[in-house]
Amino acid sequence: MSSQFEQLKLLSVLVCDTGDPELVKTSGSQDATTNPSLILKVAQEPKYQELLTEAIAWGIRQNGDDIQTLTFVLDKIQVNFGLEILKCIPGRVSLEIDARLSFNTEAMIQRAIFLSELFAATGGDKKRLLVKIPGTWEGIRAVEVLEKQGIACNVTLIFNLIQAIAAAKANATLISPFVGRIYDWWIAAYGDEGYSIDADPGVASVSNIYTYYKKFDIPTQIMAASFRSKEQVLALAGCDLLTVSPKLLDELKKDQSPVAKKLDVAAAKKLDVQPVELTESVFRFLMNEDAMATEKLAEGIRIFSGDTQILEAAVTEFIKQIAAQDA
């Protein structure tokens, strides 16, 4: 019997969720995802010093003011790590725009365009890049514009069906529903109810989104994310993509138990599901009705924003050191 990892690869595209190119290289995954939180963990490691210092030097050469220089450097760090990751996989990498722009449609559009153009100018193939945009109403409006311009988007921080429907209406290439964070909220709110894996709130949320998309032939891909256990991953076998931490990927490689397909297009099409008529007011009302989605979306933005600020502080110190050496 082959490993669960190998069995799962026959049912879903496996994606490695890390900022560490070396871990991506050994993961055996097709694609990779990263974010400021993950890059922050590895950006200052000695083995990646060159990626960091090159980004800082490039940013300084753009001759912007202090704020512009910091923006240039942060995006170049992402691009450098993204390109290094792409050397290790055959597929795509997802890079994220600044979470502090989450409620400014035009700013997100401009930042995504800049990131995409910088990626291409540094030698990247735009077809292998997904730009991560938060699943706010404003973010989804940005996605609608960007997709028309040929910039493939990964709508992240998806916590319920209405966000998924809105992203699909905007023709997003891909969405990332967060299984583990949904589960975390339910456990924090109601305690450990001893959920069976099939009743896991995070698993159920992704299953509902999958059913809706497949029922109505929606081409937007679903990449389930933020897993807390191997069991959650296996419970979504058959989902378009699964982005999994290196730790859980290793657990899957060590286990040879059989893997069953849990999500199936034909089965989804047989279910009685009604289409949702989407407007901004419907989106905002249904988000307001969903305490979990509202709270976890806000929390996710705060976490990514906070990690970006920590990364900024570290980069600022590096810039000061370089300036002092040149003085």
Curated annotation (Swiss-Prot):
Signal sequence range: none
EC number: 2.2.1.2
Pathway(s) annotated for this protein in UniProt: Carbohydrate degradation; pentose phosphate pathway; D-glyceraldehyde 3-phosphate and beta-D-fructose 6-phosphate from D-ribose 5-phosphate and D-xylulose 5-phosphate (non-oxidative stage): step 2/3
Active-site residues (renumbered): 132 (schiff-base intermediate with substrate)
Record carries keyword DNA-binding: no
Entry keywords, A to Z: Cytoplasm, Pentose shunt, Schiff base, Transferase
Main subcellular location of this protein, as a coarse class: cytoplasm
Annotated InterPro entries: Aldolase_TIM, TAL/FSA, Transaldolase_1, Transaldolase_AS
UniProt-listed Pfam families: TAL_FSA (PF00923)
Protein's GO biological process: carbohydrate metabolic process; pentose-phosphate shunt
Source organism superkingdom: Bacteria
Function: Transaldolase is important for the balance of metabolites in the pentose-phosphate pathway.
Official protein name in the record: Transaldolase
